[in-house]
């Protein structure tokens, strides 16, 4: 259990701005092997981030005046909190990927561009569109049901952090290995770590499904069958998005970088919201 907590806190330290400092940080420790073992807790980080964002969004929906634009405001501020909690870690990956692969047809040149800390036109446009689409889709879900919007936020943050584990498992790491912060995560991710990630994901999905009957009084307005169909549509859409991204990385780069993992998380999160909306 002690090792489990250490790996989780190390993953939290790596993927978010949530402070793990002082004596706690000393107790957690660090090594490339530990960071590699912590990869399975990537979705577990999504559980905490998703819970915080979902709770904040639910609070906004409760305290703000109930108008037609309330879901839009709550979605925008909830999304902003998510960006703050992660330090725009995944959005930065999305920008770098689209700068590199959108701005160059050559593999080596694309990898160089992706390492550049400056943001180009392709990257800026990709991040702006992703944020706009995320807020718009969440507002759409909120117009159907406030509870549905909050539940979607929670599950999407977990599921979208699960698919990158498959990318790590199936594709080789490319680029500057020595200078890559993600290299320990890319080396020989174990089946146990992969299973840990999927257990986190299944727990999140089970929580939402099992609480359906308990939350009917706050107007999800969906039968159990309809909720399952909508969730299935969202999960499938997210999975398809992962497959498309993985194929793109293989075709263009013959592997992945840390930026590719962040971009995958962002695209899969968007696909989940879209799939859920279509499945309603």
From Swiss-Prot:
The Enzyme Commission number assigned here is 2.7.8.26
Q: What class of enzyme is it?
A: transferase
- How is it placed in the membrane, per its record? Multi-pass membrane protein
Q: Which cofactor does it need?
A: Mg(2+)
Keywords, ordered alphabetically:
Cell inner membrane, Cell membrane, Cobalamin biosynthesis, Magnesium, Membrane, Transferase, Transmembrane, Transmembrane helix
A GO cellular component annotation here is:
plasma membrane
What is catalyzed by this enzyme? alpha-ribazole + adenosylcob(III)inamide-GDP = adenosylcob(III)alamin + GMP + H(+); alpha-ribazole 5'-phosphate + adenosylcob(III)inamide-GDP = adenosylcob(III)alamin 5'-phosphate + GMP + H(+)
A Gene Ontology biological process term: cobalamin biosynthetic process
UniProt KW Transcription regulation keyword: no
Q: In which pathway does it act?
A: Cofactor biosynthesis; adenosylcobalamin biosynthesis; adenosylcobalamin from cob(II)yrinate a,c-diamide: step 7/7
The record's section on InterPro entries has: CobS
List membrane-spanning regions.
44-64, 69-89, 111-131, 135-155, 189-209, 226-246
- Is Transmembrane helix among this UniProt entry's keywords? yes
UniProt-annotated location(s): Cell inner membrane
Which molecular function terms from Gene Ontology are attached? Answer: adenosylcobinamide-GDP ribazoletransferase activity; cobalamin 5'-phosphate synthase activity
Pfam entry (one): CobS
Q: What does this protein do?
A: Joins adenosylcobinamide-GDP and alpha-ribazole to generate adenosylcobalamin (Ado-cobalamin). Also synthesizes adenosylcobalamin 5'-phosphate from adenosylcobinamide-GDP and alpha-ribazole 5'-phosphate.
Q: Do you know which PANTHER family this protein is assigned to? A: ADENOSYLCOBINAMIDE-GDP RIBAZOLETRANSFERASE
Q: Which family does it belong to?
A: Belongs to the CobS family.
Protein's recorded name: Adenosylcobinamide-GDP ribazoletransferase
